[in-house]
Amino acid sequence: MDCARKGWLPTCLAAVVAGTILAATISHAHALSIGDKRAYHAAFAAAQKNNWKAAARDAALAHDPLPREALHWLAITRGADGASFGEITRFIVNHPDWPRQPALEQAAEEAMNGVPDNVLAAWFTKHSPITVAGKLREADLWSAQGRGVEAHALIRAVWINSDLSAFDERSIFQRYHDVLRVDDHEKRLDRLLWNDQVAAARRLLPMVPAGPRAVAEARLGLMTFAGNTDSLVGQVPATYHDDPGLLYDRVRWRRRKDMDDGALDLLVVAPSDPTHAAQWANERQIMARRALAMGRPDVAFRIAERHDTTSGPSFAELEFLAGWIALRFLSQPEVAYAHFVRLYDAGTLPITIARGAYWAGRAADKMGYRDLAASWFDTAAERFTTYYGQLASSAQGVTPIRFVGEPQPSMTEINAFDRQELVRLTRDLAAAGADDIVTPFFRRLCDEATTPDQYMLMARLAREIERPDLEVEAAKRASYAGVNLIAEGYPIPELPKGGGVETPLLLAMTRQESAFAHEAVSRAGARGLMQLMPHTASIIAKALHLRFSQKRLTTDRRYNVTLGRAYINDLLTNFSGSYVLAIAAYNAGPARVKDWMSLYGDPRTASVNVIDWVESIPYAETRNYVQRVLENLQIYRLRLSKAGFTFTLASDLKR
């Protein structure tokens, strides 16, 4: 077979692997041969450049078939042309535990043209369609089977809930206009507006009556800061003045214009809207903090408390805000306690659980219930790798931390782990230099881990393939299940020597910035281990009399850390040694930190409560960053200490 022929894509790979079955007894000792490593290294490098002919040619030279199947998987999930519906569906059936199943199913649906109805109907009974085309094809099948009511309901749901191009909108409307109702157009328009899809919403305006159209035009004006916004809002009929979407966009418009008093006036009277609780929650979080900064804690509390969220990060943040404001600004510990208990009860992750428990302890202590407070502090301190657990550990009377030994998998468990197909494939991909492709397979394995030993084996696998970022990720996953893998979760790579910044702090920041992935590049352009922006790095390099090289930020670990160490040292100097301020400045920039000091005071002074100052940071990313770095710092000091160790977070906050 000529795998390099014109038009070859995943079809060739499927042919090569057809009929090959991986023996379940292959052990860890069975590694890729030198020749296979060379062949697959070239194949995956070619695939990364979308040169599928070269990828097939190189892969055909290898003897071990499993990485070739991964190459086939990559071609399908990348949307490479050529794979038939039958090929893709067979791959899905044969690899049900492989990652990115939705992408595989999407590829199958995109290849369904010409597939017989009976074949598709059989497939859809086990795999509900996920694409617009797939759902509409299923609706047509239902219509042909006499299931018109169900078919029409599905068509309407697709119209209302799908993000469509202008071409697809016209096509669907022309084909199903007799099924779609005015009410469906109104629901679609409302969804598009809530999702800020301006262009799509404008296209739908002619399809809705005058009242909803006036509301939509006003909302679009508010979203886009149109010059005639007041006029558009004024043209909304009185019967639509209480439209939740219109009120939401008016609040958001005022907030974006820094018209905070006006935004607060609307927000405090906003009606309950559980359907769009997530959007409202964002405004409530922002405006509650602004109200607090304006010296209006009573308003801030009302805004935070009256949310419609029932779970998730927004629920946790608003319950915390309501409790914190009640405790620290309104002197209402009983009210605060109820919110903190709700936060604790809803928590599923160590940080949230520790946060709820610590602050419930603070509220109980304020109420005079010392034993209850101590119990809550004990509960928080059990999550000793978290910021709030470490704060709780310094509370008077808290039970000393007891470290539990790390899991030690037996040889039986190790051998069973090594026999797993995805474990072997992860090793093979790493050996072939396919690091980007390793990640989804590793994460899929993590999804299946349920025991301490399995989490430990995943962390060891990451270390074996020299992926400290995945080792940290495995340890974090373990912590969510109550398993602490300290050595694995807090790697200690060799760092360049230098003064000014303690090694535990440097490690703590690097763990948070990149999880030790030296080639990491953020969406904003920050690069390398310490996620340095090129402009900042160039200034530091000049000050150190080093030649600046953007490439070296992601290829030379020592170079990146040398510059990062110098930068954090400068920040510490500029902020008189304050860890809180320097860490915040590393994330958000010194100028913003100085702005926050003007708003919330100087946390280095005795008159400012530094714990409250950290909670007051208006940027969630920076607030989280400061807390995560400080908690990492304690664990790295623990790892590097040669004598007895006690958490010093409370004093680190004040330094």
What are these regions (language model features)?
Residues 39, 67-68, 72-75, 105-108, ...:
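TPR repeat positional signature
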Residues 46, 79, 112, 142, ...:
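Residue at a conserved register position within TPR or TPR-like alpha-solenoid repeats
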Residues 49, 78, 82, 115, ...:
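Structural motif corresponding to the intra-repeat A-B loop/turn of tetratricopeptide repeats
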Residues 54, 83, 87, 100-103, ...:
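Alpha-helical positions within canonical tetratricopeptide repeat
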Residues 65, 73-74, 89-90, 94, ...:
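Catalytic glycan-binding domains that act on GlcNAc-containing polysaccharides
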